[in-house]
Amino acid sequence: CGHSFKQEESDEKGALDNFVMTEIDLLKRSNFSWCDLFGDDCALLAAGFKAWAGVFFLEGRWYAVGGFERSPVRLLGVGERTVCLAQANDWLNEQESDDAAHKSRRWLNELPTPGQLRYLPPEARADFGLTRYQASALLTFKFNKHAIQRVVHAANQSYLEAA
């Protein structure tokens, strides 16, 4: 119709009243369970059936890393813990279905399989509270440890060279 709608200008700034920020606990809201691999909160890993993601702390920075079936381990992000955890969680949700997340959560109440126990170190086999999911996370880390270290150390070196 060709009518020109005029935007009313105002000198008032759009100030917010009663604004409150709330921290969201991504670990609790995730479709996957995040395992603290070594009990020091510096290495967390979640696993599905086809993919896994982890966040690892090195020299003051967090690194988000992911793996998918037979694809190479990849760097997902570098930065603060919450940001890396969000990146890793998002990536894992993109790779896995909701059904896989729910099936893997069932493993939180099941004992490790004999096959899992065979590959775990003696101290993990002696942990009678260990679940099938925790065993899966530990084994995922064990089988991908060198690739994870390579990706994290390369990213750390790049950061140091840029600084």
Say what each PLM segment does:
Residues 1-107, 114-119:
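Long, largely alpha-helical accessory region at the distal end of helicase-like NTP-driven motors
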Residues 2, 6-17, 146-163:
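Replication-associated primase and helicase/ATPase modules
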Residues 83-86, 90-94, 126, 153-157, ...:
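Polar/charged alpha-helical tracts
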Residues 105-160:
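Basic helix-extension-helix modules of the SAP/HeH family
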